[in-house]
């Protein structure tokens, strides 16, 4: 289902807000995460405006990560505050993305995103501890084996879900779609090499450790099984046999 949603910029504010609600973000006056509707609205607006010049890290990417977060939350049976936090973190995990590889310090991009979100979170009256909690979640999306990220992933179930949501499209979508996303990322980040090789390398990297959450592993296994069933159907059809 997620693969049918276009990966494009712009993704309108209205569509992005609707995807957040679909993923399970509560709609009362103050979400169970502690954010007011005003705060959530400002975060959605900022996310929808993200990176008009970026080929990959734009609002379309945010939409797909939010959808993945919703599916993972459902699989993990998350409700209330935890689900709201996961969806909000997925929405804002790449705010103010540079649109290129950063040569700056480790976690630079994640801290930039956390800083942009913190201004809104605290500025609309939420507890500073909530901003710190969101920052910890965002650090989990850095593709590094640094000891800080390893410790966060080991101790924080929501961080494991967010890290999986961030890469879920690349490891679970049909190969042609995943390859298209890789082309966008290659152009944006100016990564040398062919898209096929980059995707293969990334899949091998993920394959060494697997996804971080039980929910992610279950959904990935289901996606792989569905793709295999489709391939089997095509193979049977090619022999001229009836497919039930």
Where do the language-model regions lie?
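Active-site flanking loop/helix segments enriched in acidic
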Residues: 38-67, 96-102
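Eukaryote-skewed repeat-based solenoidal scaffolds used as protein-protein interaction platforms
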Residues: 25, 29-34, 135-139
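Inter-helical turn/loop segments and adjacent helix faces that build the functional surface
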Residues: 76, 102, 120-130
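Short amphipathic alpha-helical interaction patches enriched in hydrophobic/aromatic residues
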Residues: 24-27, 48-51, 73, 96-100, ...
């Amino acid at each position: 289902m997620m693969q049918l949603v276009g990966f494009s910029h712009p993704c309108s504010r209205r569509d992005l807000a609707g995807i957040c609600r679909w993923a399970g973000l509560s709609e009362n006056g103050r979400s169970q995460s502690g954010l007011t509707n005003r705060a959530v609205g400002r975060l959605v607006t900022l996310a929808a405006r993200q990176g008009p010049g970026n080929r990959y890290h734009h609002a379309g990417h945010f939409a797909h990560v939010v959808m993945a977060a919703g599916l993972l939350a459902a699989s993990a049976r998350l409700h209330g505050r935890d689900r709201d936090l996961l969806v909000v973190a997925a929405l804002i995990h790449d705010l103010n993305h540079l649109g290129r590889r950063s040569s700056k310090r480790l976690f630079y991009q994640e801290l930039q995103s956390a800083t942009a979100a913190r201004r809104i979170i605290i500025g609309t009256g939420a507890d500073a501890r909530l901003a710190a909690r969101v920052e910890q979640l965002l650090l989990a999306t850095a593709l590094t084996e640094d000891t800080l990220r390893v410790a966060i992933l080991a101790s924080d179930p929501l961080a494991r879900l967010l890290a999986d949501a961030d890469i879920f499209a690349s490891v679970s979508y049909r190969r042609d779609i995943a390859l298209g996303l890789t082309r966008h990322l290659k152009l944006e980040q100016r990564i040398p090499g062919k898209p096929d090789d980059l995707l293969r390398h990334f899949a091998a990297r993920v394959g060494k450790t697997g996804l971080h959450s039980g929910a992610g592993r279950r959904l990935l296994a289901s996606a792989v099984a569905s793709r295999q069933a489709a391939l089997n159907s095509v193979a049977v059809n090619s022999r001229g046999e009836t497919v039930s």
